[in-house]
């Protein structure tokens, strides 16, 4: 299947969108991933023979800054994305191991899946912040990342440190080369996977499709 992603443009007319949806269908596009929700737009999309999916950030959740400040990921320097995000101000990533995070996200996506004319949901930012950016972006931030720097390496919050120590007997903050420790790498990968599993089960139980942007 072929898909397109788009932001909802309030300045475009209904006729503009109908023409665009028809063109997408003619070009062999299967569906549209929308950033945002507009019931009429989703309905028109489906009337054109396309699937309509709701695209949304997963681990990057600034709406929780005041409600659950403890849920945010912490880097190797002890800095939280709650008040000191990496790279850009909107990088407010959650820690997947905090109790309540996975359930909150699953409930949020199910609410989206329940919306009229929504065929499925698409998960983006299903990860921790970039520990190393592409070389082409280094100059944008005035950095050089020839190795993993502690200020971009997450999550070293108390919950993650405790859980990892229970599993391995080691504190991740005491690892000499955390970037090469496979058990520490897998610990964080598995934490993200468990969140995705919970979201997936909840959305599929509602009879809707789910996909993700893998980085």
Predicted features and spans:
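Boundary/entry segment of secreted carbohydrate-active catalytic domains
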Residues: 1-20
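Hydrophobic faces of well-ordered beta-strands that scaffold small-molecule active sites
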Residues: 2-6, 32-34, 52-56, 121-124, ...
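The substrate-binding groove and active-site-proximal loops of carbohydrate-active enzymes
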Residues: 5-11, 28-35, 87-104, 178-193
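Active-site beta-loop-alpha junctions enriched in small/polar residues
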Residues: 7-9, 37, 57-59, 126-128, ...
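Catalytic domains of carbohydrate-active enzymes, especially glycoside hydrolases
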Residues: 14-40, 115-118
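Aromatic-lined carbohydrate-recognition surfaces of secreted/lumenal glycan-active proteins
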Residues: 53, 122, 126, 178-215
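Active-site-adjacent "subsite" loops/lids of carbohydrate-active enzymes
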Residues: 53-116, 133
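Active-site-proximal loop/short-helix segments
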Residues: 122-180
């Amino acid at each position: 299947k072929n898909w397109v992603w788009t932001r909802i443009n309030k300045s475009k007319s209904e006729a503009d969108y109908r023409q665009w949806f028809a063109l997408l269908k003619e070009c062999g596009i299967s569906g549209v991933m929308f950033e945002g929700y507009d019931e009429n737009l989703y309905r028109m999309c489906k009337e054109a023979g396309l699937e309509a999916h709701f695209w949304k950030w997963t681990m990057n959740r600034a709406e929780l800054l005041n409600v659950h400040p403890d849920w945010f990921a912490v880097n190797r320097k002890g800095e939280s994305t709650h008040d000191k995000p990496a790279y850009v101000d909107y990088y407010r990533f959650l820690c997947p191991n905090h109790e309540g995070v996975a359930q909150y996200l699953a409930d949020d996506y199910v609410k989206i899946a329940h919306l009229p004319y929504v065929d499925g949901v698409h998960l983006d930012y299903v990860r921790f912040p970039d520990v190393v950016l592409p070389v082409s972006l280094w100059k944008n931030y005035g950095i050089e990342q020839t190795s993993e720097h502690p200020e971009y390496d997450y999550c070293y919050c108390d919950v993650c440190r405790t859980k990892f120590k229970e599993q391995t007997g080691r504190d991740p903050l005491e690892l000499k080369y955390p970037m090469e420790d496979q058990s520490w790498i897998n610990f964080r990968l598995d934490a993200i996977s468990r969140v995705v599993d919970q979201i997936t089960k909840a959305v599929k139980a509602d009879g809707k499709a789910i996909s993700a942007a893998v980085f």
